[in-house]
């Protein structure tokens, strides 16, 4: 009988993880600025931070225009080569290039409110452990500082 309760407990834990992980992995912040001001402020703040680079700003409203009319929506791709080099010097860590460069989303909803969405890099890094965890945790904290400069929360 106790094995049944163990299995029930495992099933419940699995369901809890299944439903809470998306809420933990993706974080949404409301911007106190307009859409254009948010994209500009985030890009400029990254450029001013030591060792950070903005690699691209992708305008999805423009890109998807032939297919659908969207509100304003973009992603900003950024990188810190110093942090990246700490991960990439070890061959066994190079598979995480699938998560590089880092990025965040900026979008305007149908009500005109502007939001920033981002992966929880610290939590993501913990899934890998070691150097990846250490570096992604530090990078995630630095990215959070940038977002706080335009966020209401």
Predicted regions located by residue number:
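Compact, glycine-rich, soluble single-domain proteins
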Residues: 51-55, 59-102
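Terminal, regulation- and interaction-focused segments at domain boundaries
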Residues: 13-54, 58-60
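C-terminal partner/receptor-binding element of secreted or periplasmic proteins
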Residues: 121-153
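Beta-strand/loop substructures that line and gate deep hydrophobic ligand-binding cavities in soluble
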Residues: 102-129, 133
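Generic structural motif
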Residues: 34, 81-83, 109, 121
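Feature marks short, highly hydrophobic, charge-poor N-terminal signal-anchor/signal peptide-like helices
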Residues: 1-9
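Non-transmembrane interaction and regulatory regions of membrane-associated proteins
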Residues: 61-62, 107, 145, 149
């Amino acid at each position: 009988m106790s094995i049944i309760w163990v299995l029930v407990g495992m099933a419940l834990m699995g369901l809890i993880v299944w439903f809470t992980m998306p809420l933990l992995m993706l974080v949404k912040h409301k911007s106190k600025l307009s859409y254009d001001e948010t994209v500009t402020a985030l890009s400029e703040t990254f450029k001013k931070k030591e060792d950070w680079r903005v690699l691209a700003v992708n305008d999805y409203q423009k890109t998807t225009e032939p297919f659908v009319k969207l509100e304003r929506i973009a992603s900003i791709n950024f990188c810190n080569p110093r942090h990246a080099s700490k991960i990439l010097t070890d061959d066994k860590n190079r598979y995480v290039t699938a998560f590089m460069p880092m990025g965040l989303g900026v979008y305007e909803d149908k009500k005109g409110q502007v939001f920033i969405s981002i992966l929880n890099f610290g939590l993501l890094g913990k899934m890998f452990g070691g150097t990846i965890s250490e570096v992604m945790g530090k990078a995630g904290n630095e990215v959070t500082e940038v977002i706080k400069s335009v966020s209401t929360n």
